[in-house]
Amino acid sequence: MQVILLDKIAHLGNVGDQVSVKAGFARNFLIPQGKAVMATQANIEYFESRRAELERKAAEVLATAQARANQLAELATVTITSKAGDEGRLFGSITARDVAEAVTAAGVEIAKSEVRLSTGPLRTTGEHQVRFQLHGEVFATLNVVIVAE
């Protein structure tokens, strides 16, 4: 199935590229999320007339993500308190939602879907490196310190 991309998609293409994808991927993901449209003749002509506007919009989204990454870099560390045992193991765990709430409370708006916990939920006290994917190509890291209550 031929689609025209309205957003940059990793391993697929950039804004305006006409690519061939499987029908299910287009119908169930790309088109409902507003990341692509079917490559009909009418859509191709319409897209060509709006190409500059869509590219400008994509550049604004990228600039916003980079600004948020700079804010995260300035933040340096975020501290989260949680109940823990004597050996430093938490009663429960710190999830992506908890990290997102702590960073948002510190002044940088982050959604839980942007938090990347590579080893799963954090289960021990101490300092942990947390990675954030703010855009398809904008990443940031932040030290999260977990202290016992």
Curated annotation (Swiss-Prot):
Pfam families: Ribosomal_L9_C (PF03948), Ribosomal_L9_N (PF01281). GO terms for biological process: translation. Keywords: Ribonucleoprotein, Ribosomal protein, RNA-binding, rRNA-binding. GO terms for molecular function: rRNA binding; structural constituent of ribosome. GO terms for cellular component: ribonucleoprotein complex; ribosome. It comes from the Bacteria. InterPro entries: Ribosomal_bL9, Ribosomal_bL9/RNase_H1_N, Ribosomal_bL9_bac/chp, Ribosomal_bL9_C, Ribosomal_bL9_C_sf, Ribosomal_bL9_N, Ribosomal_bL9_N_sf. Signal peptide: none annotated. Belongs to the bacterial ribosomal protein bL9 family. NCBIfam families: L9. Binds to the 23S rRNA. This is Large ribosomal subunit protein bL9. The gene is rplI.
